[in-house]
Amino acid sequence: MSDLKSKRRNAPSLAQHTYPRRVSPENSVTLRHHRLARDASLQANSSRSQAATSSPRRNSSDESHDTGQSDANKWFDQSNLNPTANYDSNAMDVDPPFYQRESESSNEGGKIPYHGGSVPMLKPTVTHSSSADDYRSVIDDLTVEIQRLKEELKRYKQFGSDVMKNEKLFEIKVHGLPKRKKRELEATLRDFAASLAGTSSTDMASSHKKKSSRHMNRMQSSASGSMSKHASSSAGSHSRPVDSAYASMSTGPNSSGTSLNRPSMSARARTSEQKVENYLRDIPEGLYPRHMIMTEKERKKLIVRRLEQIFTGKMVRGANTSNSYQVNSGLTPVTHDGQSGKAAGLHQPPSLKAPPINVENIEPAREARILPADNMKKSRSRDNESTSNSNQDQTESGGKTANSGSGSNTSPPIAPPPEQRPTRPLDLDPHRTQVPSENMEYLRHLGLVPPELLPDSNDLEGDVAPDADGWIHLNLLCNLAQLHILNVTPDFIRSAVNEKSTKFQLSRDGRKVRWRGGLDGTRFSSDSSGDNSQSPVGDETDSSSKNGQRKKRKVVTADGQTTSAPSSKEASKYDRQISQSSDSFHYKPLFAHHPSSHETSLDTGSSYGPPEESAQGDSRWGLSGSGGTSQRKKRRVDGAIVYYSGAPFCTDLSGDPGDAGVDSQTGGISPATYMQNAGQAQAKAEARAEKGKVPPKAVRMVPIRSQSGSFLPHRPLTAFSPSTEDVPMSDVDEAIALEDDIEMEFPWSDSQQYLEVRPLEPSGLGGVLPDDNFMVVVTTKRPHGMEPGEKTPALGRTKSDETTRTTDSIVNLLASMSTSGNENMPAGRPVLHKTGNIEIEYLSGRIKRLNPVPLPPPAIFFPPFSSTSSYNSELDLGSDADDDESSEEFMSRRANPHQSDNEYPDDVDITSGDEVGEEPDDELAPTDDDEEMESAGDEGGASRGRAAGPRSARPSLPSGKSAGHRAVRRTGSLAATAGGEESGYSSSAEES
């Protein structure tokens, strides 16, 4: 072992002789560079420690530093010859070529080279990919969280309308509550919120009075001496008449002392703001813009109902929508003491009469007061005396009298006008309750219907003479009925009144109408179903009593108005009419989804209204609340139910799929029950048809979709079931009775079938007269439910035999008809015809003569070379035609100039027009010789054939020729010849 170590120790010396190219260790370049790199690393570590303790920047004493300039060549050599000396893992590999090295003045001794790359301030920022990915993931998570919080905040901040934000009372959230229980809770909370109508305003006013009581006392004490001075001046300044119905709220007797109540300006501002909010809140549903999809007949009926409602006072639908707002909106009719109720009662039902109401307990009226009818009869000129008397009555009823400061008045005394309130949206509701007495009073005030010329009560149902008075401009009634909402023209309104109304009399010029009298409007056929009922709630007409007097219970409401209530037998009908609203003017979905066995169509339906469209807890389309819910239940949001102070409705931001057609308040059927499936509607229609109430043809078939979504009643690619046509077979009066001993293995139809009569284009068929225009009516019999692949033994023939038999049957049929006239075919030998796999049996047939047809224009005209040759050829053709009377000649006859114009087969009759050379009878009217037929088969066939050929008194060649063809209907009927359209052409007009 020791020898081996000694050999290794002496190895470098031996290498000199063994390897002459190896140099000594002292002269080795690798070892020298290694030493230099080690020394450089030591110097770099020392300089790094010095840089951490002392700053290379300028000191606070503003002494300059010694700087040295680096040479580019020196930097290049140092970087290439000593690459490891400048290596630092946290710095750049080399220094820049012109880096200014800095050194402090306090440094002693040799200058240590300073490497700026080791200073952190001069290092470039290095981005680590791992840390960037971590930050990116955090940013993504925060973004998702922010989006989720935004959605949640949006869900919680759904306040509905901003107008009602100040009236917000409370809000609740419901989780997992059944729909019926939720309806009950909503109804209870709505009643509670509606009962707090004046609580908030009263508390606010009381607190304001407590705070300003001292100030009010001081103001009253200081203004007590000036009250007498300002009384007369204020009364005189506010005594000017106001003719407009939109009178300002500051006018009237109550506003005489407004200058003294300065501290109550804030309360007035709050009151005015509340009035504006109430104005915007009470917008009725009838004023919302909507697109109505109605037919022309429905629109005319609606126009007539609107016009007759002015005189009858009977609502079309939804009478309860405006009754609940009568107290708040001031729609309660005010009956004045001097009003003549007898004249107004002629056009007012007994249930709509209201007793006199104390004027002090209600708010001011919107309309300007009209003088009573008695005063108008006594004095039409409205002198000062009547004006002063009426004004005195008004001041006494208002409880305020004017203090006259002066003893004598140079001008007539003018009392302040009665107070008026501004017009509210509910006053313009087209579905509001109409009071006929007020409407008649307004028309009398305009001088259009004098009271003495109104029809008496005993002559209500009689007609009105056209020269009597009482005509009213139709434009005025259209404005009163607000028909501009329906977007109809005056001409359309005139046509509706003329066609649909039985209570209006239209003038000759169409500008005026007159009410014929009566308590009820026009009754339409659709009113019997109850959907389009014109009668108001509890006011159905009785056919037994002409004057409409019925025994009903009268209920006095809170405002003193009497309404008639139905009996217990009419409870269901009463509730059904209560729940009906103006949903007929809103959009209804065209397609109703078919419900499953455990879910109705209302559960999967949707409410299409905005959140502000709720009234009385039900939306326009019969769904609870007012929020819209989507058909996809995954997108539903559990929002809050917001209740407002004094509002009889709530805002349900979560939505409600709706009940199964039951109203929570009345217990009746909701208006949304019209969304029923097509199967139930079809069953009801068929049941009514079976009972005999509706004829079978009047039953409207409800389209039923198939699994593929098609409305077609048959599948043309899978089954052969020819569709029936709309043109009835009017030519056949009665069908021929079938023999009783015929046995069939397949079902037959005995009902009358509808045929299609297709006219043929005119063609110049050679040798056929224009009068030869006829139609072959054939009675056929065929199976109804035979399968496509089923065959009978009698039909097992070859194709050639079938074609031959078909041709022979047609020829024999025409030959028999030409020889025997209109006699029927023998029933013992029916003609069988096979089309595909369906057997067709021809029972009988006849020929019906039609009007002549015009000739088509000639395609090619050849002038005759000589009259003699053409005349001889025509004579030859005529002689051949006279000799041959076979069946083929009947199909295509040759032209014969010597034949008479009205020459027909012996046994075939002609019409009266053909006998005298005049125009024939009507084409569609059957002739005298047409035999009565009865369609006993499943489908009768009729085809029309017309043949036309050139005729002339001068013998010549035919102007146009074409090959004759037979037209066979797809149902099996046949046509003898090809012809053209009917035009009443007569052959006598051709002769010159």
Swiss-Prot record:
Main location: nucleus
Domain of life: Eukaryota
Pfam families: FRQ
Locations listed in the record: Nucleus
GO CC annotations on file: cytoplasm; nucleus
GO biological processes: circadian rhythm; regulation of DNA-templated transcription
Similarity section: Belongs to the FRQ family.
The protein, known as: Frequency clock protein
Source organism of the structure: Leptosphaeria australiensis (Marine fungus)
